Amino acid sequence: MTLSKEHKAAVITQFGGNDKNTGKTEVQVALFSRRITELTGHLQQHPKDKHSRRGLLMIVGKRKKALKYLQQVNIARYRQVLADLDLRK
């Protein structure tokens, strides 16, 4: 259920600029979103997996907090992340 190194590196370079910039809020939100999609697929196959469901809810909360922080700090970067990840309609 974890991201492979190649997928993680691709997400980091896409949203962070280079492979060393992992602390950027956009990178963290993108990684959270990627893990959320993977866990959602896992939970569709295994609906009784309550531990993974709890992990999914925790990751959703972390992404929500990171997006709220990004919205308060820089609204332009927030809107760009939403557009790139197709999070809001």
UniProtKB/Swiss-Prot annotation:
Entry keyword annotation includes Hydrolase: no
Native organism taxonomy: Bacteria, Pseudomonadati, Chlorobiota, Chlorobiia, Chlorobiales
A GO cellular-component term linked to this record: cytosolic small ribosomal subunit
Annotated keywords: Ribonucleoprotein, Ribosomal protein, RNA-binding, rRNA-binding
Biological processes, Gene Ontology terms: translation
Function: One of the primary rRNA binding proteins, it binds directly to 16S rRNA where it helps nucleate assembly of the platform of the 30S subunit by binding and bridging several RNA helices of the 16S rRNA. Forms an intersubunit bridge (bridge B4) with the 23S rRNA of the 50S subunit in the ribosome.
Official protein name in the record: Small ribosomal subunit protein uS15
Family that this chain belongs to: Belongs to the universal ribosomal protein uS15 family.
Keyword presence, Disulfide bond: no
Subunit structure: Part of the 30S ribosomal subunit. Forms a bridge to the 50S subunit in the 70S ribosome, contacting the 23S rRNA.
A GO MF term: rRNA binding
